Amino acid sequence: MKQLLKFLLCLILVAPSTSIWSQKKTDPSKNGRGGYEYFIGVVGNPSVVSDMRWDDEQLEGLKELGVNMLQLSVAWGGKPGNEVINLEDLDAEQTAKWKYRISQAEKHGFKTIAHFGIPRMLNFDPVKPACIMEHAIQDKYVHLIQDFMSTFPEVNDIMVYTYDQQAWICSEFGPCPKCTGIPISDRLPGFLDLLKTTMQESRKDAKTTLWWKPWELSKGQTIDIIKKIDPNGFGLMLNPSTSNEVYPFNDGSFKSDLGVKRMVQYAYERDIPVIGEFDHTLYKPLYAIDDYFPRLMYEQMIGWKEMKGIVGVKEYYGFAPSVYSVNYAMLKAWMKSPNAPLEELLNQIAAPYGKKTAPLMIQAWEYVAQSVEAYPWDVTYLIGPTGLDRNSSGEHSWDYVKIMNGTWDTPIWESSRRANFMLTDSKVAHPWIFEDAGLRLNDAAELSFKAVEYFDKAIAMNEGLVDDIKMQRDFILKTSRSMKGKGLHFALTIAAQDARTVQGDPAQFEIVCARIKSLLEEDVENGFAEAEVKLTEFNRDPKAWLKSNFKPLTWKSEAEPDWSKWITP
């Protein structure tokens, strides 16, 4: 009896530890890729063509990051590095390139995914879509998919853009005779079903998935298509915002973007897997803003993780290892420990800088993150000319400020994005928009300047990695000056017109002139040498100065051809 009791006691003691060990072994969060089934990476990015290399070192680095699937080309609209973006691009040279990439991927344990724009436009400018209601177009893509599946038997996943990537869909409002009067959300599901069925029939002994990116479609159209599509062998690839691109912050995305929430929810209810895209760099090195804001990287990953039905994530712009990235360090740390709190991961990635320096680096990165959040993203899509031009160091013209805005003839731009951006196709805008943009640029600049102060304190510690800290500090200082200079351009434009408006009232004119003088002094302090001359001229004769600086041409208006009138036959 005693022996039986001892045996039972041993079972009781051993069972829990065995169960815990089993849980640890099977805990999905411990799989090295944030617990996801998929972590898709892009080798290189459109701005760093030299990093589009599929050598052993590059691929091992991505494997260590947690990536388990690779996109076979950078697939960017401008075709940097002559990368494939359409099935039609796969000539003998490109096929050989992909064969090599697939062999390299298999060598290092990666699966692969192709990325195409379908259907490719018949004419690019003016746009003429390839009509998906035409039997000839349908047959063409059935044959192209069949050829692809035969040529690349290792590839079971294809990602498709039906807008952008040189693809386009006919409008229901004309002029296509087959599509006029038929909504896109009634036409596109059948075409997508045709593509994925062709994949399935070409690879009957394997699981294939057509991943669709509903880029440029409105929220309503996308949701309607999700409801109508056959979910078998179909998946969604979604941005973190229905109206913005894949920026590394939560403004207008995740919890606050009901469009993303609804799409993910409908997909979940229909057993459609979703892969969420993220950008860990903000198009680095395209704009004057670099990836030194790890908190935003963390929040972006948490945002996707909190949604039901997200089976994986995909880097949107690509990985360029030759360009240093603090955000990359955070991404790597999060993928290994997705349940760890932010503070723990920040301490981990800051540790190499030294015990005394690490807290200073964390504070500097936090101010950079706040600066990114403060930037006026919602004014215009064209952020480069609005303080983030990489070549700017704070200089500006002495003409009145303008806001470049842009739009395209797509469903999303004519609907949801008009709520996301204040200006899309406006020729004029209320001065308050200009005032708002200038004030927020100044706020973003001040936060970046605070980051520079902490980078300077970190450098003074002289514990280690000083050259790296200096690199971060110098770049953020340049960005600070660029945003500050652009903010001053906005402020001076408004102040100058204010002064012209009240110049008949000496007391009021003096108040506004004091404001202009203060702004010019800030311009000088920001390192803009030309502002010193302008300040001297203004102090000498304010009224004469106002006649030649930031002067609106109220008698002149520029017109250009209405390019939408050209329709390709």
Q: Where are these predicted regions, by residue range?
A:
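Sec/Tat signal peptide C-region and signal peptidase I cleavage site
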Residues: 18-22
